[in-house]
């Protein structure tokens, strides 16, 4: 029986563990946090005690279901999304989302989904090393040195090592040190974010089946996203620059009060006061893109998820691509009958292209959402109208393909570019 060591037991690592265990691998998962089935405190935001809401689109949903997790249990971790709302001048412009298949995106409770993955990993016989950190990775020896709360180091020997340990991956750092010509790029956005949580989303006018976006009328100052989370609260991510005023470093109460009054004026005064209180009290979080020149080392070590391609959340695809990574990886193992020397290089070949395309689109979406652009809404309607009239000539709505299909990201990027060309032609005409 082959032994797989997975460093990182989050969403990507957990799903990969289930896939491999069901294929007969002996799976060992090293996770620095505690067991979410016993205590979720280390899996949620330390300050707000709530996880940031995330959106699971069709590619993520299909990847989870392919691992044998029942759809009903996955659906119980979130709410189906039927529309997006864009706030401009205090008014919402709604955009209905029409599914192309029998799936709708889910506004997901990350902590509940994590518990679901751990439940099925346990049922599949996965062994976890909770509250253990990875100290060292032997790339050629296929072993990892770990340390638990007792301070005693322990070496785990395997037949493969999977790095699913996030944007600051210890496995990727070992590859950086051990591989010649390994290229790594970490790009910080000029914005960061803080997550604010308000109780009783329904009373505040937020629908649980809708994603809300802010900042379209801010002239590039900020971007925001809000979604109802399963406990009935609304989670609002406020993205601001680190410099200037207002910014994430602003501590002047009148300045930030004016900001919330300007862009969230539709909320009651007590809600805006609570947003102000949380904003001034909470630390900020960075937004980064991580790119690696390769996702593997020989047939020994593989990176997936954020360890390979951490992405700022402006396309809503970071988690979805990570889950698709897990599915793609095991499908390659199946295709090559477990031959890691063939499957690992092909994984890099296939997924590197997709990761780069996804990150480029996320950056482009960030620029759109944080810039004043009233044409944005007309363009979306124009695209749908033109495709309905000339389906063989005019490309479909890229957003619908993104949310409702598993179309490869490089193909979606081509659609986006074609739309740009045709839209410019349409404007000239």
UniProtKB/Swiss-Prot annotation:
The protein's annotated pathway: Pigment biosynthesis; violacein biosynthesis
BP terms from Gene Ontology: antibiotic biosynthetic process; kynurenine metabolic process
Keyword flag Coiled coil: no
Domain of life per record: Bacteria
SUPFAM superfamilies: alpha/beta-Hydrolases, FAD/NAD(P)-binding domain
Catalytic activity from the UniProt record: protoviolaceinate + NADPH + O2 + H(+) = violaceinate + NADP(+) + H2O; protoviolaceinate + NADH + O2 + H(+) = violaceinate + NAD(+) + H2O; protodeoxyviolaceinate + NADPH + O2 + H(+) = deoxyviolaceinate + NADP(+) + H2O; protodeoxyviolaceinate + NADH + O2 + H(+) = deoxyviolaceinate + NAD(+) + H2O
Cofactor annotation: FAD
Annotated keywords: Antibiotic biosynthesis, FAD, Flavoprotein, Monooxygenase, NAD, NADP, Oxidoreductase
Binding site for FAD: 3-21
Pfam families hit by this protein: FAD_binding_3
Biotechnology: Violacein production is used as a biosensor for the detection of quorum-sensing AHL production. Violacein possesses antibacterial, antiviral, antimicrobial, antileishmanial, trypanocidal and potential antitumoral activities.
UniProt key word NAD: yes
Name of protein: Violacein synthase
Species assigned in the record: Chromobacterium violaceum (strain ATCC 12472 / DSM 30191 / JCM 1249 / CCUG 213 / NBRC 12614 / NCIMB 9131 / NCTC 9757 / MK)
Lineage: Bacteria, Pseudomonadati, Pseudomonadota, Betaproteobacteria, Neisseriales
Name of the gene encoding the protein in the UniProt record: vioC
